[in-house]
Amino acid sequence: MNNVRPIRRALLSVSDKTGILEFAQALHAQGVELLSTGGTAKLLADNNIPVMEVSDYTGHPEIMDGRVKTLHPKIHGGILARRGIDEIVMEQNAIKPIDLVTVNLYPFAETVAKPGCTLADAVENIDIGGPTMVRSTAKNHKDTTIVVNAKDYGRVIAEMQANNGSTTLETRFDLAIAAFEHTAAYDGMIANYFGTMVPAHSNDECHDDSTFPRTFNSQFVKKQDLRYGENSHQKAAFYVDTQIDEASVASAIQLQGKALSYNNIADTDSALECVKEFEGPACVIVKHANPCGVALGANLLEAYDRAFKTDPTSAFGGIIAFNQELDAQTAQAIVDRQFVEVIIAPKVSQAARDIIAAKANVRLLECGEWNTKTTTLDYKRVNGGLLIQDRDQGMVNLEDVKVVSKRQPTAEQLKDLMFCWKVAKFVKSNAIVYAKDGMTIGVGAGQMSRVYSAKIAGIKAADEGLVVENSVMASDAFFPFRDGIDAAAAAGISCIIQPGGSIRDEEIIAAADEHGMAMVFTGMRHFRH
């Protein structure tokens, strides 16, 4: 069966004019008759590209301030007509076939993101005719070609040039999928926006904004299929959120190494998000989504060396993240010292790349620099539902903490407390972190009782010969009993940072005073499950 369809007439109507002139010129060069609307038609005419206004083609003017332009039988009949079936109906109604439609939609997302956007502004940027044409063309992909993204202009022209002015069914079907994805995302954004409008009274349109819509719509695009999931019997794929513009594992470029696994991606995300918390040279080593070593240094090499010393055993087969360009010295130290699954950094020097290339299986990622963090949502799937929350971007500075003990922390201890608190945010609850001089010396993660996390952190430090005496400790949540304080004191901890908020806070503070320890409250918890 012949699956190519010639393009003799095209309708172009775009809000984003990127590349449209070149596309229209190429279509004209192929002998395609061009129809267009409003601003797009004017742009083409101003550049001497022959074009017919849709209103002239239909014999009906745009009405209602442009709200009704393309909603006409001559447009949708021309798009939806089945070639070889509907010709008689088309002739009876003076309808000509439209073989290609190029549409991108009113900028709804950009409009509602602007400060001071009103509901009226949002409403006027809800496209009606555009999505209708997109869906009509995509539905009739057997005969018509839909283009919703400027990146596909060149592809369509190249195929027409290779097929005597025609497109193939394979291409039309692929473009139809992209079109339905496009309209689904567009409608989802509109539904989310309106869904956050909470009526103050039953007869009101809207008054109050809710953070979370009545129904939640989000679209993720598949980046790659994965060999398997968390375990080898599970199928998996990696999807990315194209609305997020931030340095991340999702946007990172893989420079070398084996394909990333499901667990690689999850662990790399944990490592990268943790290292983003620090300004000076820093290194984070993660194993099973928990930091097993975090450190600051005068340079990356020192930061890596100190992070590795926290727990060399757990660092084996781990993920290493840096917050500055990976240099040759640090790369050589990693290659000489340990087996590593993934290394990620904002940038990797050519010299470092050459060194790591000797370990062909090591996955080396470059994620780009980061300046700000995007305000996004976190999702957690439960059986039959989805938990959604704000991303945990809670920050605590020195001026935010409250000293609750008799003993005052020193300036150096306060620096270590801030460092330790940042690390604890990325450790699975119950989380306890011991640190000294900008270096973790023990991490207790994921225990069902807080006291055992405290004990494990001490055991880890002792196993590596790290001195706990006069170190500081961070706890991601309050201490329900004094036993965690007693365990920390026995290990040699001299200062503690924790949220506070327990009904036994007075008893906890008294325990710290009894041991001669300094203690500060943050008033903020960092549970991580």
Swiss-Prot record:
Disulfide bonds: none annotated. One of its GO terms (biological process) is 'de novo' IMP biosynthetic process. Its EC number is 2.1.2.3, 3.5.4.10. Residues 1-148 form the MGS-like domain. One of its GO terms (molecular function) is phosphoribosylaminoimidazolecarboxamide formyltransferase activity. The IMP cyclohydrolase activity resides in the N-terminal region. Belongs to the PurH family. This is Bifunctional purine biosynthesis protein PurH. It comes from Shewanella frigidimarina (strain NCIMB 400).
